[in-house]
Amino acid sequence: MPRQRAPKEEEAELLTKQERSTRSSEDASDASVSSISTTSLVLEHINNPAINGTSRSRRGEKYTDEDDEAQEAFDVEDGRYKAPVAVDKKTRRWLWIVGIACVTGWALALVFFLMSGSYKHVSTRPHDPLASSTKGSGKKITMDDVFGGSFYAQQQSVKWIAGPNGEDGLLLEKNTGNAGYLVVEDIRNKGDGDSSAKKTKLMQKSSFDVDGKLVRPNEVWPSKDFKKVLVQSDFEKNWRHSGTGKYWIFDVATQTGEPLDPENQDGRVQLASLSPQSDAVVFTRDNNMYLRKLDSKEVIQITRDGGSELFYGIPDWVYEEEVFQGNSATWWSEDGKYIAFLRTDESTVPTYPVQYFVSRPSGNKPKAGEENYPEVRNIKYPKAGAPNPIVALQFYDVEKAEVFSVEIEDDFRDNNRLITEIVWAGKTKQVLVRETNRESDILKVVLMDVEKRTGKTVRTENVAELDGGWFEVSQKTTFVPADPDNGRKDDGYIDTIIHEGYDHIGYFTPLDNDKPVLLSQGEWEVVDAPSRVDLKNNMVYYVSTEKSSMERHAYSVFLNGTGTSEVVENSGSGYYEASFSAGGSYALITYQGPGIPWQKIISTPSNKDKFEKVLEENKHLDRFVREREMPILNYQTIDVDGFKLNVLERRPPHFNEKKKYPVLFYQYSGPNSQEVNKKFHVDFQAYVAANLGYIVVTVDGRGTGFLGRKLRCITRGNLGYYEAHDQIAAAKIWASKKYVDADRLAIWGWSFGGFNTLKTLEQDGGQTFKYGMAVAPVTDWRYYDSIYTERFMHMPQNNAAGYDNSTITDVASLAKNTRFLIMHGVADDNVHMQNTLTLLDRLDLAGVENYDVHVFPDSDHSIYFHNANRIVYDKLRWWLINAFNGEWAKIKTAEPKSQVDARLERR
């Protein structure tokens, strides 16, 4: 129903309806490119009110009634109906001069117009992600485009594999059509017409029969000699990285399969792993470990006391989520004679119940009479300060069939130890163990000799004393074997180290040396390094931020720290990922942006045989992007309290500095994270800018990654303070810009970003931001898991004040914001619903009501169950539009509409 419009709504309309009308006019005129001459096209554009500025609703002005303009044009007083009057010579001369000037000006405008190419449809132009303005016109980005995968770049999944005799440059490929289901191909033959004869076929078909049962593989792992394939089928998900399945041994020569455990072929296996010698498989079932030697049908049980609270060879929930980001805690020695594994005892870990009101993830039918009760899954979840699982490293001697442990004199106590990485030192029967204390600020590297069953700490670092920070979990330590003939006298390893406040890589040799050879240094950082070590050429490959913290480039360096060079020559500005072949002679280079992504395989600097093969160019995506009006990306840095922070500003197409735009801040802000980078990425933020016409700003504030430890570690012990402060400081900078409507600023985020959204609103108290949207937020760090939280906050017992400061408690400050939104998955096993519910209770107690809540039954942290993910973004969109249209401001002063007598209405 029509109602009185506020001035702010009219300004919002100028950014929505009016602009859509203007752009539709541009689209209509541009659509005629192929059917009319250039001259008529130019005239059409010049006469188009949307282009020449004579639109009745002028940008930057309030709405103008059309009847008023018509009256002004045809006013009786303008002389329209007066008799013609003769023009004298002087006047005619001036008219000629003015006419000639107009024609000349028109001609110059025509030349400029043609040279600028403004008449062209946007699809005729190459995509320029760093363009400062939009030329031409195109289709608007839609939500279906974003969430339907239209902007996804095709990428070929390349899995490098070493040949049985150490051959390099081999690829493992699945679903290759006529060539077979699982094949090994030399990269030099890839794409050379009918090269099937040059491929090694491991599995011809995509299924096989075992005792009348059809087996369809989910995952496959070839043995190192290419004679067997370990096959997983019938996978059922457990947590984020884990699940169970049925496992099979497939014989390549006969193309037949058999059960991993012939006596229990329907048993659900949690993890299975082939030995490096291709002669055995170790696996975990029902939390106990087993060994199957492939020359026998017999299965040997390694452990027997595993159960609901004791795991062997696999991680529990918190280790899976926060340490390994995977489902394996089992490691074969290179000679296949020993197996290292974790024994995880979570009997003292408290339980958290997760409720499912719609589904039954267990697959079990409820008991009679309990059909109407929710299914409850109890998770052993250690919250900050609560007892952690007790983790111990154990070994299994395959020949002796014996389980044993190696004691270390100066080891951490059981309740103060995190085991984060295990690396076998080749065939030396030694193993490197990376451990930290519970708060992750003291590191120990332990060297164990499993044959002698002795061990010692070879390296200790206390980063709390160094810079007050923490150690990140890493599984990139790489063993480098001795090779005296090739200049490597002793065994060693490469690890990430801290050098002058930045993450770099160092080479430790011999194994017990605690002083590394520096392989990289500078005011930039390595990323998940090293990527590969070429032992033949003593060369190390790594990816770093040397050119820009917003970019990634691949480099090589010799083991003595000299000869650094870029893998991709003249790569320019960009975000590159690199995956290196087993021997380091080839690399899959994936260009992620800012332009259209592409992939190619190249020879590396250590390979004298130059090679290059393009795998993917994403031409379809390039065409699709050209036809759309993309947001204008403006990368920059801002100074906040002496720190340089990276910023990405997404501007609407056809951005006009004379207009006033609302601004949405999107951030994650978590420790060591990064959102501002130069990847090609079209997401909800791009949609908001390109379709809704709002500016979207992302700021990586203090605490985020790849800008050095000084900026990163300042947040320790007080999460949320600097993160929120920096968002507010950035918002004030944008609020002062002439093209920003300072009364329409909002912020949103998910997970840690949801926490920081609420923390920002709490700290700001409505002075800068008026609106916020928080999805799955932490509201009290005492509720989050111990390993993650204590790394950045210490234990609550050691930092009670810090936890109090980080908790969202100042609800009176939240009440000063115009309105905020909270959404959460009820079955979130990561950030528990408890976080949102306890905040709602605080709001209720204080009588705060300026917020909306949406919960999603049975959804976990990703919020996907029953169409929930699309609803999240639809809700964000709808809620944001209402915020910037001023609807939420009206709710504060809402009054009932006066009732009209029905008898008067009938009259």
Curated annotation (Swiss-Prot):
Vacuolar domain ranges by topology: 115-907
Reaction(s) catalysed by this chain's protein: Release of an N-terminal dipeptide, Xaa-Yaa-|-Zaa-, from a polypeptide, preferentially when Yaa is Pro, provided Zaa is neither Pro nor hydroxyproline
Cytoplasmic topological domain residue ranges: 1-93
Extent of Basic and acidic residues compositional bias: 1-26
Molecular function GO terms recorded: aminopeptidase activity; dipeptidyl-peptidase activity; serine-type peptidase activity
Function: Type IV dipeptidyl-peptidase which removes N-terminal dipeptides sequentially from polypeptides having unsubstituted N-termini provided that the penultimate residue is proline.
Protein name: Probable dipeptidyl-aminopeptidase B
Organism of derivation: Pyrenophora teres f. teres (strain 0-1)
Gene encoding the protein: dapB
